[in-house]
């Protein structure tokens, strides 16, 4: 399926570049808009076919200001009173048409485990992210902030599970971290 989506996207981009090369007048706005819409439709199709997962997920040093507006942490070592802040870019999110808008809803579970897998803390349905838009978004981000104050120094694993309530799909990822 991913190969098909790549072929569709590649064909659309090839078509768009051929359109630009064939048009001697680069200021023809309608042709540019048509090419952009064709490429956008191919990206939406690829995103709709993608399994639920993360394009990007990492610890960041502050609450992100928006999509791709984050500061990655230099490492995964946290002070005892420092919150864990995770930036995510989910992909494969299901969007359903509700009237004039598309909507999605993700529910987050987390657990904190020892390196040997023992669950030390956690919560089901810890966070919920719902989004509505006039068009299916190409880019989507969330962030998660966890207060681990009081946890002793040591190595841990943050397990995050995201449930897509529209599709019924889930995905899990682990982020190792230390408290020093």
Q: In which residue ranges do the predicted regions lie?
A:
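Intrinsically disordered, low-complexity terminal regions enriched in Ser/Thr/Pro/Gly
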Residues: 23-180
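Positively charged n-region of N-terminal signal peptides that target proteins for export
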Residues: 1-5
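Bacterial N-terminal signal peptides
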Residues: 7-18
């Amino acid at each position: 399926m991913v190969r098909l989506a790549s072929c569709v996207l590649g064909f659309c981009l090839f078509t768009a570049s051929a359109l630009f090369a064939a048009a001697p007048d680069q200021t023809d706005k309608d042709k540019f808009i048509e090419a952009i819409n064709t490429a956008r439709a191919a990206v939406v199709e690829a995103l709709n076919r993608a399994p639920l997962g993360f394009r990007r997920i990492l610890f960041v040093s502050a609450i992100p200001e928006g999509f791709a507006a984050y500061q990655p942490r230099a490492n995964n070592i946290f002070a005892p009173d420092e919150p864990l802040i995770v930036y995510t870019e989910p992909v494969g999110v299901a969007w359903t048409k509700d009237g004039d808008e598309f909507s999605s809803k993700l529910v987050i579970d987390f657990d904190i485990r020892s390196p040997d897998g023992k669950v030390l803390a956690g919560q089901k349905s810890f966070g919920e992210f719902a989004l509505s838009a006039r068009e299916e978004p190409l880019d989507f981000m969330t962030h998660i902030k966890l207060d681990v104050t009081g946890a002793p120094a040591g190595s841990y694993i943050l397990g995050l599970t995201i449930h897509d309530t529209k599709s019924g799909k889930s995905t899990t990822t682990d982020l190792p971290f230390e408290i020093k």
